[in-house]
Amino acid sequence: MHRIFVYGTLKQGCGNHHRIFGGYDIKITPAWTYGKLYDLGWYPAMTVGTDKVYGELIEFNNPEILKRVDYLEGFKGENHPHNYYERRLVDVFVGGATVKAWVYFLSVKQVKRYDGNHLITGVWLNS
C-alpha cells in the first residue's frame, strides 16, 4: 500500500487530481500533517514547520501512481540536485490514527524565490 498526503492541485476537485489519479483505484480521506503552507500563485508549497497543514491522504496499490506524482512534482530521486520538490515520509493524522505517508516539500529558499505567501489557515484553496 502506498500513501501520499496532498495539499494542493492534487486534492479532489483540483486541477491535477483527475490528470494523475483518473482511472486508478484510490482511497481519499481528509487528513492533516505538520508543516508550513505557502501560496505561490497557481499552486501551493509546503516547507518543514510546526503549523497544521490540511489536505487529503491518498492510498493506492499501483506503484505507477507514485511515479506519475514524482514526475508532476519534479522529484527525480532522494537528494537529487535537480529536484523541484523533495519527497519525505512523515506522520499524517487521519481521524484518531497516525500513518506514514509521502509528502512533497519545497525548500524555504525556493519559497522565498517565488515570494510565497504564508497561509496561516493551513488550507490552500484552488481559486
Regions found by a protein language model. Name each.
Residues M1-S127:
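Glycine-aromatic micro-motifs
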